[in-house]
């Protein structure tokens, strides 16, 4: 008998399979990933380089920013290979923004911040980034597996390349939080952002899957479409308890 975790894995694998076999659905989901990578260009407090007093941390941020720009190009090419439009989504539909809506922690640097305040905000940024990257990496693992069944081979190559970077990002972002703060404070920051991401995942998944099922209902197999609608109800219910 499957465990609850096994059931979730089975459902997610099936959902990604149903998405990649339809170029329209596939393009829409790739646009969700792309808009997450583009997010730092649309806000003014992401990757707060001014807060980094450690040259190695600053270099890690610059490398991360460059890799995200490369991911934008990879996703855009994958979407175009599917003959679908590259979209700029409203910020409330971008996962980074949804996570931030579930916590009051700020990493916007202001002139009055002293060194300790800047260090704490930088740690909050990396805590946020760690759990964002961890969730995206897991989603990409499902997606790259499903891409073997896509109508075009390029998305699989693009997603695999992004995934390699994301797995490295997951590791280093956690390490930076632990480098910046004493152990107890680092654990508190990581716990705060773990909770924010957990709630955001339920929120974002329910909204985005619900939208796909409403706006693209005919593109899903009828019985599985009904099943996925049931899943969105479960997600919304879980969010009220999270």
Feature names for model-found ranges:
Residues 1-242:
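Non-heme di-metal
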